[in-house]
């Protein structure tokens, strides 16, 4: 009649905080959150059920209840905030924290969650009860709260030296231990080996203070939960085992936990010594006992699956005996599951790191093989230093002699000094100077000016392309429009610089009669010459005597004899095109050239034929 009304949330809250759970079951926790959000009075009933669970004497039930309350505060809004900040719930927290039988981990978890809820409810003054309860708990239990994080200070040289000394001492002890084990194994005294190894293992822990340097500490256990406040810090919970990597700051080390790497404060952890030989033997013995019960577990399972429903289990002694024998190994089995689960995670992380390192190495190796040193294969070809042969220009066929020397086609640029071609190269006029009397350049007449008989000045024919032979000097070369001459350089001028130093000094030159008649006829008809007159100012005097041979000497008839002996030539000697070596010098009479400006006098053959 006076029995309290059953709470609808007792079952689902008890399911989410069951003592048999190995960890928080978030599926059950979220089911409670969904039901509270859908019910108007769900937050009040759920908090009442959690107060009952806090009175449970099992520490796991109390810890799971704190996680459920924290999930309600984050997912159910102001309705859950109001019930969590109520006097009934805060009083239940204070009673549990002040109880001397409460586990220290439960007390620290109470203080941690009350701090979070105080910050969460600070914007609403109606929820000030939680803040007052938190301040009261801190004043009554100052040792519950986790220590403050130390400042990050750089490691001094003295600290580095101390770390190195501890490392050397640990290495020396390890070497001593190995030597002791080897000597005892040779003596055959197994009992003495166990005693010596145990003492050797205990020596480093006695000689090295706990938590001094990272050189001698491989693992630490978390004493408190740590929430990172800056990038690079490692998050962990109380009880986690952290692998130590190195020391970074004065009171901060770098460690690895569940695949994450970061720094953590030393006052939040405690050093874990490496297991001794005795501890390893106890672990191996415990594993052997667990695996020895496998047959009994399988036998018990077979009996229970084949028994009839009418069978009374309590009366069956075999089933009862098997059940109690297998029940004793359950705590050991859970411990081994946790141990090998941790090892499995460590091996998985190690494998992932190895795979990543191998991929990075292969990528770098492939990149170094596919990108060799810079080569010059793809560079464009450099242009030649000589001008192309005149035969490549349209309208000027080139009669190159076979097997010419490369020097014959080289023509320096105007800014370069010309190179003299060999005087006796086959294919040049005057290759045999002993058969032709060549006058020196000082005795060569200048027929470009008007003669005494009124003959007009010979126009200067300039090549349409740079000369090929060595006749060209450093003067600027002009390029007039294309003409119909095969070898226009032969008619450029009549003055040549003879390369023969022993030629006669007083030979007189004049035009051939046919040439003179042609010039007079051109002057009478008023035809305009197609070649520009020579200007001494345009071309500087040659710097070296030219190897260009002059025209063949004929008996002077008309006009009157004229001789010129200038002190030095004031013009550029014109080069002549090459002629096939099979063609010799012309031995007949001199024939005049007819300019192409008049149609009736247009040449019908190569102009070079007049000189052969």
UniProtKB/Swiss-Prot annotation:
Entry's family note: Belongs to the STAM family.
PANTHER family according to UniProt: JAK PATHWAY SIGNAL TRANSDUCTION ADAPTOR MOLECULE
Residue ranges, annotated region (Disordered): 176-212, 372-612
Extent of Pro residues compositional bias: 538-559, 566-578
Residue ranges of every copy of the SH3 domain listed in the record: 215-274
GO MF annotations, alphabetized: phosphatidylinositol binding; ubiquitin binding
Entry protein name: Class E vacuolar protein-sorting machinery protein HSE1
Location(s) in or outside the cell: Endosome membrane
Domain VHS intervals: 16-145
Topology in the lipid bilayer: Peripheral membrane protein
InterPro entries with a match to the protein in the record: ENTH_VHS (IPR008942), GAT_dom (IPR004152), SH3-like_dom_sf (IPR036028), SH3_domain (IPR001452), STAM (IPR050670), VHS_dom (IPR002014)
Organism per entry: Coccidioides immitis (strain RS)
GO cellular component terms, semicolon-separated: endosome membrane; ESCRT-0 complex
Keyword terms: Endosome, Membrane, Protein transport, SH3 domain, Transport
Domain UIM: 162-181
């Amino acid at each position: 009649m006076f029995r309290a009304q059953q709470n609808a949330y007792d079952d689902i809250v008890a399911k989410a905080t069951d003592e048999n759970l190995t960890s928080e079951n978030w599926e059950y926790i979220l089911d409670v959150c969904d039901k509270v959000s859908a019910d108007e009075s769900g937050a009040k009933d759920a908090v009442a059920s959690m107060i009952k669970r806090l009175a449970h004497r099992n520490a796991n039930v109390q810890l799971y209840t704190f996680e459920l309350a924290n999930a309600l505060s984050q997912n159910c809004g102001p309705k859950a905030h109001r019930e969590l900040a109520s006097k009934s719930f805060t009083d239940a927290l204070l009673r549990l924290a002040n109880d001397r039988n409460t586990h220290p981990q439960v007390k620290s978890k109470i203080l941690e969650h009350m701090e979070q809820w105080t910050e969460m409810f600070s914007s609403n003054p109606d929820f000030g009860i939680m803040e007052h309860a938190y301040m009261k708990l801190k004043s009554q239990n100052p040792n519950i709260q986790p220590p403050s994080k130390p400042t990050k200070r750089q490691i001094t040289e003295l600290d580095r030296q101390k770390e190195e000394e501890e490392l050397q001492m640990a290495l020396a002890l390890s070497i001593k231990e190995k030597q002791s084990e080897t000597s005892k194994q040779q003596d055959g005294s197994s009992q003495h080996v166990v005693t010596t190894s145990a003492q050797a293992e205990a020596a480093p822990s006695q000689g090295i203070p706990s938590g001094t340097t990272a050189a001698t500490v491989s693992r630490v256990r978390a004493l408190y939960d740590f929430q990172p406040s800056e990038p690079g810090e490692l998050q962990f919970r109380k009880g986690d085992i952290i692998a130590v990597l190195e020391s970074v700051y004065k009171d901060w080390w770098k460690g690895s936990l569940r695949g994450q790497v970061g720094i953590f404060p030393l006052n939040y952890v405690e050093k874990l010594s490496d297991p001794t030989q005795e501890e390893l033997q106890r672990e191996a013995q415990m594993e052997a006992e667990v695996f020895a019960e496998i047959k009994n577990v399988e036998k018990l399972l077979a009996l229970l699956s084949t028994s009839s429903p009418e069978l009374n289990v309590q009366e069956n002694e075999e089933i009862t005996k098997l059940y109690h024998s297998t029940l004793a190994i359950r705590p050991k089995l859970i411990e081994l599951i946790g141990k090998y689960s941790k090892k499995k995670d460590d091996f998985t992380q190690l494998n992932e790191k190895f795979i990543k390192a191998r991929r990075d190495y292969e990528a770098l190796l492939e990149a170094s093989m596919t990108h060799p040193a810079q080569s010059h294969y793809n560079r464009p070809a450099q242009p030649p230093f000589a001008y192309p042969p005149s035969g490549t220009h349209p309208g000027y066929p080139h009669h190159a002699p076979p097997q010419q020397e490369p020097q014959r086609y080289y023509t320096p640029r105007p800014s370069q000094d010309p190179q003299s071609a060999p005087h006796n190269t086959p294919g040049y006029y005057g290759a045999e100077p002993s058969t032709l009397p060549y006058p020196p350049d000082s005795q060569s007449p200048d027929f470009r000016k008007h003669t005494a008989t009124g003959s007009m000045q010979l126009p200067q024919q300039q090549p349409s392309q740079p000369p090929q032979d060595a006749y060209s000097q450093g003067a600027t070369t002009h390029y007039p429009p294309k003409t119909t001459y095969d070898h226009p350089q032969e008619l450029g001028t009549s003055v040549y610089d003879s390369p023969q130093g022993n030629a006669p000094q007083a030979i007189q030159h004049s035009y051939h009669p046919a040439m003179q008649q042609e010039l007079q006829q051109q002057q009478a008809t008023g035809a305009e010459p197609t070649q520009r007159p020579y200007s001494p100012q345009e071309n500087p005097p040659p710097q070296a005597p030219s190897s260009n041979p002059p025209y063949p000497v004929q008996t002077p008839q008309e006009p009157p004899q004229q001789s010129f002996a200038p002190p030095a030539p004031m013009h550029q000697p014109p080069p002549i095109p090459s002629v096939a070596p099979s063609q010799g010098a012309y031995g007949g009479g001199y024939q005049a050239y007819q300019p192409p400006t008049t149609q009736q006098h247009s040449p019908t053959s190569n102009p070079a034929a007049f000189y052969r």
